[in-house]
Amino acid sequence: MTDVTLKALAAERQVSVDRLVQQFADAGIRKSADDSVSAQEKQTLLAHLNREAVSGPDKLTLQRKTRSTLNIPGTGGKSKSVQIEVRKKRIFVKRDPQEAERLAAEEQAQREAEEQARREAEEQAKREAQQKAEREAAEQAKREAAEKAKREAAEKDKVSNQQTDDMTKTAQAEKARRENEAAELKRKAEEEARRKLEEEARRVAEEARRMAEENKWTATPEPVEDTSDYHVTTSQHARQAEDENDREVEGGRGRGRNAKAARPAKKGKHAESKADREEARAAVRGGKGGKRKGSSLQQGFQKPAQAVNRDVVIGETITVGELANKMAVKGSQVIKAMMKLGAMATINQVIDQETAQLVAEEMGHKVILRRENELEEAVMSDRDTGAAAEPRAPVVTIMGHVDHGKTSLLDYIRSTKVASGEAGGITQHIGAYHVETDNGMITFLDTPGHAAFTSMRARGAQATDIVVLVVAADDGVMPQTIEAIQHAKAAGVPVVVAVNKIDKPEADPDRVKNELSQYGILPEEWGGESQFVHVSAKAGTGIDELLDAILLQAEVLELKAVRKGMASGAVIESFLDKGRGPVATVLVREGTLHKGDIVLCGFEYGRVRAMRNELGQEVLEAGPSIPVEILGLSGVPAAGDEVTVVRDEKKAREVALYRQGKFREVKLARQQKSKLENMFANMTEGEVHEVNIVLKADVQGSVEAISDSLLKLSTDEVKVKIIGSGVGGITETDATLAAASNAILVGFNVRADASARKVIESESLDLRYYSVIYNLIDEVKAAMSGMLSPELKQQIIGLAEVRDVFKSPKFGAIAGCMVTEGTIKRHNPIRVLRDNVVIYEGELESLRRFKDDVNEVRNGMECGIGVKNYNDVRVGDMIEVFEIIEIQRTIA
């Protein structure tokens, strides 16, 4: 057998390692968990375990149960039976002979030890008794000797006492005389002290009586009903008797106190202390209790006459209750002040800094605004940015209307086929690329042109230096072209106009110039500042001139940036990759971004684990105006967030968490307030249909664009509600949320995973996949149109003129009519018109032609018409027959 480790042996025997180590120790072998065990040691352990198993005691267990019933007498003469079960258990152990011999030897040794101890105790007691007897005999001899000496001394004293008796009698007489004189002096001193104490007590009593009289007249008079104490009955005679009894008791107390004060004081110090106590009591009570009845309780604290103005420190958000505590006023007063200012709030509602400042200043306090982002400012300022600025490449954003050729133009510049990769041939993300030309490097941002991507275009305009406005020569200025011009003007960015599709026969560049001039984009030949370049992305004409125009504009701008030091930039786009996690496309503005840097990006932070350029190649660093994809963030940042490299990851995490908390607080503080204009909307809120949507997309910008577009579809009757949105595939959580809220699951360029598909199948959820935003918006419009209540329209189908009126015993007045227009149908709603004024609206009850009931009468025929519940039909009236049709409404 080969050696094995103790841990493996424990696993083989299915026992714990500690127990196996203990068994080896019991067998006399010291082992640890990692030691090896030989075959000999295994045999030793096995023999030890067998000995233990053989030598183990045999046990015999006897159990016995007895059951009985006990009758317990209860209330009402009824008895209750209780079942009692007694269980007994005895265990007999059969020991082996060796153990029995060992126990017998131990018992024998114990008995011998007890016998030896008993004998030693008896001998010790005998010795102690003998010693005690000897001590008592010695003491008896001493006592006898002392008594003998005492008798001899008494006989000698008897003789001497007779000689001194005469001298003692004379001394005692002298001593008695001195004691009598001292007693007389002491008695006189006590009488003088008592007389002084009595005079002092009378003076104090007189003073107390006088003060009681003054308080009686100066105290606030109380009502007659309240002068008496508590009564135990409501009878008037009984209450009077109680009052009389109270007065007698009070008078007796007063007399008792006065008598005590007038009694002679006892002798010594006790008399003085007693007199002092009586004097103090008399001063407090004031005679017969007059002062107690006349006094009234008064509050010692005086309320300040004027309000106290405080310095109130207010953060970015604060609750109404906290603001009230800082101003040392009640919360209701703060709420009243807010209502006077036109804002309604509860005591636990969070208000923003501006509102709190207005309320505090309205209540007369001085406000100190506190900045809570000191840590954030410290982290952002602790950066290396002291290097000299160097020229950098321009960042160019290509903007324009959808399908005007923006991506195709950039595609020709980069000599790649990017447009074919976009769904439907339209751009739905910001594409960031940098291109090396003969005259230098240019960074391009390609933005979507669809109407839904307004915020994405606005971000592109803010992050750029130059805007290239692409306008199709055959199409002219379109809505998104105007919007791109507005974004460029808002960002203060120069515009270079690229008139595309110049190779088409219907191209009209002059028309483009005229239309753009209406929006403030004037060509240089007209005295403006914008360069116009005629290009064709398909044929490649004018591309070099466009690049030269861009570089010329960049030279005029003198673009510079710090190349060394810690980088900063902006998030162009972000998405969640299933294999790589959160990925952000970052455009570096200044500094150099290195792999391994700690970045703070909006609400997220992290260390750059990897960087890739637009071609998917790994790079180690990125300088100014270079777009890169970075991995390693804690979450998906929002597009447009600032990216900053910081020194400390712990501080970056604190700042990110602080930003998340403040964003939530500010969002709660700025929620919809209860204003008058919202009350009517809230009243009709229950009548509004809702289309709930859970939206997942591949990138953050698409989520933003689709959410904005869908929310704009809402009407007064049907509202779109985005229950949840995010970046990445559809997960089980999204499916559960959609099932709970009865929502439609929408995936834009993403798919559901296996667990989500199971939930979708089991719950029969509506799951839609899209890759083009047009289709998504159209289908949501169709779903909303199905929720609209149909429109009811009245369509006139016939008109009849009353020529004569007949009387019928069954129907009343019957109008003999001639059908002048359309068809008259039975049981249709009608109107009776007199002089083109509606005088009755009801139902056509009877329609006859030649005494036969018919269902309809056509134009040019005569008929008899009976109007239900109406008899005032006259000759010359017009009867108008109509029907109500439903028209399905659609979302515009």
UniProtKB/Swiss-Prot annotation:
Residues 254-269 have a biased composition (Basic residues). Residues 93-159, 166-216, 270-282 have a biased composition (Basic and acidic residues). Residues 446-449 are annotated as: G3. GTP binds at residues 400-407, 446-450, 500-503. It is found in: Cytoplasm. It comes from the Bacteria. Residues 425-429 are annotated as: G2. The keyword Isomerase does not apply. Residues 93-304 are annotated as: Disordered. One of its GO terms (cellular component) is cytosol. Keywords: Cytoplasm, GTP-binding, Initiation factor, Nucleotide-binding, Protein biosynthesis. Residues 500-503 are annotated as: G4. Disulfide bonds: none annotated. Its main location: cytoplasm. PROSITE patterns: G_TR_2, IF2. Residues 391-560 form the tr-type G domain. Residues 400-407 are annotated as: G1. InterPro entries: DNA-bd_dom_put_sf (IPR009061), EF-G-like_DII (IPR053905), EFTu-like_2 (IPR004161), IF2_assoc_dom_bac (IPR013575), IF2_II (IPR044145), IF2_N (IPR006847), P-loop_NTPase (IPR027417), Small_GTP-bd (IPR005225). HAMAP family: IF_2_B. One of the essential components for the initiation of protein synthesis. Protects formylmethionyl-tRNA from spontaneous hydrolysis and promotes its binding to the 30S ribosomal subunits. Also involved in the hydrolysis of GTP during the formation of the 70S ribosomal complex. This is Translation initiation factor IF-2. It comes from Salmonella gallinarum (strain 287/91 / NCTC 13346). The gene is infB.
